[in-house]
Amino acid sequence: MITVSNLGMQFGGQWLFQHVDLQFLPGNCYGIIGANGAGKSTFLRILTGELDSTNGSVTVDPTKRVSVLKQNQNAYDTYTVMDTVIMGNQHLYDVMKEKDAIYEKPDFSDDDGLRAADLEAEFAELGGWEAESDASRLLQGLGIGTELHYDQMANVDPRLKVKVLLAQALFGNPDIVMLDEPTNNLDIEAISWLEDFLLDFPGMVIAVSHDRHFLNTVCTHTVDIDYGKIKMYVGNYDFWYESSQMVQAMLRNKNKKNQEKIEELQLFIQRFSANKSKAKQATARRKLLDKLTVEEMPCSTRRYPFVGFQPERELGKDVLTVKDVSVTVDGVKLLDKVYFSVNRTDKIAFVGENELAQTALFKILMGELEPDEGSVKWGVSTIRSYLPKDNSEYFDGNEMELVDWLRQYSAKKDDVYLRGFLGRMLFSNEDVFKPVNVLSGGEKVRCMLSKMMLSGANVVLLDQPTNHLDMESIQAVNKGLEAFPGVVLLASHDHEMLTSTCNRVIAFQPDGTIIDKYGTYDDYLAWMAERKAAQNA
């Protein structure tokens, strides 16, 4: 159990949160949510003991083993992948290494033999003989093949290092697991595996996340950081959202009724306070008026942008034909004779473990990369707009003010018009004069969305649009794509967005080919599960 008592955290004279009293119980999964800057990661770091709070205390059952998802990908570069995972249980790893060191000594003494015997017993009790096979299962579940298990971490692709550190956090049956954005940089298959793992996990899980599907799937409780407070709700993200909306609606309704009653009483008092026959009634109403209040609506840290794409013209019958496209990058064949056509009602989810293939295809479609073979033909009625995964070329070294940066992509040049689009993306007042090269990752994505909204496109291509965005911005993008009457080509890890937006799935296979299925993303997953079951039968 973890007990949080009168906890408060202050930065620069401002309280992030205070007067926090919570209990986290075994067997539950807690999802921590809140706007960017609300203090989610700070609160988690206080729970892990990495950060001291300004006041209050956190008490963790000392008999329980706590495992934390590490954030420094390069901290284990001198170790093998296997050792890095086993270090998730540091005591087991220390016993294993001490035991191995004794056996490697050239002058093995009687004392060494006695110590080795003790270590062997402890090693067995800690599950040491199953450690490598357990670690291997975790790695394979996350999509890391056995050929990499004994490689040095320094030689491992950064995208896979994230998975290794996640396997480390899950290794060895810890009692409590604390995860900060565990689905970041994971492909959808790995996220699905993680969800299944946590559903079966008997211990306590505390996770910061902005992945709605993940939170809805695994969480039994939701911990919301807002209004300078931290509140715990029983239920998943959707239950929290409905509950919080209901509470706000009730408060607004109560305030409205109280305000109407206040105005009615004030009018009566004003009219009859000087009337002797009504004096007692006026006095009674004045007492009632003193009891009525209109509660101030607290100011939320959540800010909701607006995403809306308005096409300049309707699409014609011919939208896009991709014919036998192949491309090899750095000696790896990413696309092999890929063929598909796009209809004007299509909203396509591009999925698969190989994100490089998705990005390569999008670059080919936008004319930024030449295929080795094949052709791409766009319909004459199409107007395309593109959100790349890597937007650095638009911002790095660019000292233009934000409003001037956007102006270069707009037919209308006046400030009021441009600031209207920036305002939809939460850039207001002095924000519009920021140099674009100092913007955060999330701000840069919101700039790109402003650019897309200006384009009048009837075909939008988005490569991992939710990277760097908070929950509120992700929901805004989701709603914008759902409402968009044109064609959507979407590569994303966001299960909720794919399911609610798309009516077709194109899945990239390891050999560079594709699977093309009409239906929702959930329909595709069900079809894949049936296919796998049939293959294993």
Region spans (language model):
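Short low-complexity stretches enriched in small and charged residues
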Residues: 25-26, 276-280, 301, 344
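ABC ATPase nucleotide-binding domains
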Residues: 251-265, 271, 276-287, 303, ...
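A structural signal for long alpha-helical coiled-coils and helix-turn connectors
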Residues: 103, 241, 270-273, 290-293, ...
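Short amphipathic coiled-coil heptad-repeat segments
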Residues: 136-142, 267-271, 287-292
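ABC ATP-binding cassette signature C-motif
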Residues: 1-255, 309-537
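Short, flexible cytosolic linker that couples an ABC transmembrane/permease module to its adjacent nucleotide-binding
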Residues: 298-314
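ABC transporter TMD-NBD coupling linker
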Residues: 285-303, 347
